[in-house]
């Protein structure tokens, strides 16, 4: 009797799950979710802290020519980047530590620390960049 009840419970759960899955995908085509990254810290090991006032999300793409060097800068708020193409080396100029990112990598940039980036590859770098800033502010400060 226990086996029958357990089997019935599993069949009912499977039927309910199938209905929910079908409701989520009304086209009849399968939906595949592939996790790309999960981070709780920046590239330099800081905890990710969000702005305390009204948050604005800014999304942009960056195209960085082969051999190009970005100026030394910092970000007062969280910045995330997905490397769509190319190879980028980011160096924390305060510590000298460098990280190299390639196509498919996800970057959680350091917050409030001076750094610069160099396209170390032979092809252009293309980044999808997402900033979370206090509304009305910018997220890049150039070092003078």
Enumerate the predicted regions with their spans.
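Structural recognition of the beta-strand scaffold that forms the well-ordered cores
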Residues: 72, 81-82, 107-109, 126-129
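Ligand-binding loop in jelly-roll beta-barrel domains
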Residues: 112-137
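Histidine-centered metal-chelating micro-motifs
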Residues: 69-71, 89, 107-118
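A short, N-terminal "cap"/entry segment at the start of jelly-roll beta-barrel domains
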Residues: 4-5, 14-58, 91, 100, ...
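Short acidic-glycine-tyrosine-enriched beta hairpin
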Residues: 64, 95-112
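A short beta-loop-beta micro-motif enriched in histidine and acidic residues
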Residues: 52-55, 69-80
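Glycine- and acidic-residue-biased ligand/ion/polar-headgroup-sensing regions
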Residues: 76-95
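N-terminal post-signal-peptidase region of extra-cytosolic proteins
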Residues: 45, 62-68, 76, 112-114
């Amino acid at each position: 009797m226990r086996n029958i009840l357990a089997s019935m419970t599993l069949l009912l759960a499977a039927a309910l799950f199938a209905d929910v899955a079908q409701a989520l995908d009304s086209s009849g085509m399968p939906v595949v979710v592939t996790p790309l990254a999960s981070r709780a810290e920046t590239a330099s090991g800081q905890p990710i802290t969000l702005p305390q006032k009204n948050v604005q999300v800014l999304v942009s793409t960056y195209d960085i020519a082969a051999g190009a060097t970005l100026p030394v800068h910092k970000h007062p708020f969280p910045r995330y980047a997905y490397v769509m193409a190319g190879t980028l080396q980011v160096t924390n100029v305060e510590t000298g530590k460098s990280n190299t990112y390639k196509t498919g990598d996800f970057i959680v940039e350091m917050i409030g620390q001076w750094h610069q980036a160099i396209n170390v590859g032979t092809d252009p770098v293309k980044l999808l960049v997402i900033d979370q800033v206090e509304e009305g502010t910018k997220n890049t400060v150039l070092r003078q």
